[in-house]
A protein has these predicted regions:
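Soluble "head" domains of membrane/secretory-pathway proteins
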Residues: 2-50, 54-59, 66-75, 80-102, ...
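Alpha-helical transmembrane segments of multi-pass membrane transport proteins
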Residues: 35, 107-108
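Alpha-helical transmembrane segments in multi-pass membrane proteins
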Residues: 103-105, 131
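Hydrophobic membrane-insertion alpha-helices, especially the h-region
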Residues: 108-122
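PDZ/PDZ-like domain segments forming the peptide/carboxylate-binding groove
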Residues: 108-109, 127, 136
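Small-side-chain structural scaffolding
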Residues: 112, 116, 131-133, 192, ...
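Aromatic-capped interface at the extracytoplasmic side
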Residues: 121-132
Length: 326
């Protein structure tokens, strides 16, 4: 057992070192939570199986052996006329049956870790909104839930789709792996689906030559920027949503990356026009003049999709934020 204790301590130390290096950004380590959770599930699952098939039966056999020896001793003493027997066999049995610490921290945690793994990988995943690119729909600090099966179930870590699901629709708020750096998750709104011609010229959106309907709303006060922005309601897809425009920012798109299928886009002083290639999506933030989106780094391939965002489950600074959104 001392060998298993040492091995387990090394495994747990490895997990702790990885998490610590990730959190402290030591050596440029980029954490992969999906991979970490998968490995934790696999390791604790192996311990759980070993506990059920090997370690627990051995402890039970040892406890039964103690009980049998104690009963034999009682029988011998009874034959000798001695009725009072010293020793607490139940206490010894309890200590033998107790899981050692290295099983408590592995096999004992497996059911919880496995439940989290299944829930996060195939049903719902929580995210925290880190920036203001989706204001006013989503605010910095919103904790949201993402539906992982609407667009098809994908295998964790490798993100390979195993069921078709529904295709993303214009207007959906989608979480995806940032194409220039897939280790990062981004959240934007689906503006163009495969085959669409998307144009954002002079801060007006058109899809396939048709202007997307918008109507003016009262100005939005951004508490972080401490200023008002022009606010509009836009009908993109089945449900309307709000967006912001900054009249002081030019329509020109500066600092564009060299991305795949860039030849499908034409940039001008007025903005950008793109033809969305097959299997890709054109994404934009609702905070139109403060969003690093497809205008800058290109299209999102289907293989990068994580899921559909649909619910704010907590904002510790504003509980009124809890609820669904469009």
């Amino acid at each position: 057992m001392s060998i298993m204790s040492t091995v387990t301590a090394l495994i747990l130390a490895g997990f702790a070192a990885y998490v610590g290096a990730w959190y402290l950004n030591i050596g440029g380590i980029e954490g992969n939570f999906a991979l970490l959770l998968f490995l934790a599930t696999a390791v604790t699952g192996a311990y759980w199986v070993a506990e059920r098939l090997y370690f627990l039966p051995r402890r039970r056999q040892a406890a039964q052996a103690i009980e049998a020896a104690q009963q034999q001793r009682r029988d011998e003493l009874t034959r000798m006329g001695i009725q009072q027997v010293d020793g607490d066999v139940e206490d010894a049995k309890g200590k033998l049956l107790m899981q050692p610490w290295w099983l408590d921290w592995t096999a004992g945690l497996f059911p919880v870790i496995a439940a989290v793994f299944v829930l996060r990988s195939f049903l719902f995943e929580p995210f925290k909104i880190p920036s203001g690119s989706m204001i006013p729909t989503l605010l910095v600090g919103d904790l949201i839930l993402v539906n992982k099966f609407t667009y098809g179930i994908r295998l964790p870590v490798i993100n390979k789709k195993i069921t078709e699901g529904n295709a993303p629709q214009r207007g959906d708020v989608m979480v995806f792996r940032y194409p220039p750096k897939p280790s990062l998750d981004y959240i934007k709104r689906v503006v163009g689906v495969p085959g669409d011609e998307v144009a954002y010229l002079n801060k007006r959106l058109t899809i396939n030559g048709q202007a997307v309907a918008t109507s003016a709303l009262p100005d939005f006060f951004d508490e972080d920027a401490v200023r008002y922005f022009k606010q509009f309601e836009e009908q993109l897809g089945a449900h309307p949503h709000r967006l912001l425009n900054d009249p002081d920012r030019p329509a020109f798109v500066p600092g564009v990356d060299n991305f795949p299928f860039k030849d499908q886009c034409q940039y001008s002083i007025e903005g950008v026009r793109c033809k969305v290639p097959a299997g890709h999506y054109f994404m934009m933030g609702d905070n139109r003049d403060n969003s690093l989106d497809s205008r800058y780094w290109g299209f999102v391939p289907d293989s990068n999709i994580v899921g559909k965002a649909f619910f704010v489950w907590m904002n510790f600074g504003n509980l009124k934020r809890i609820g669904s959104f469009n």
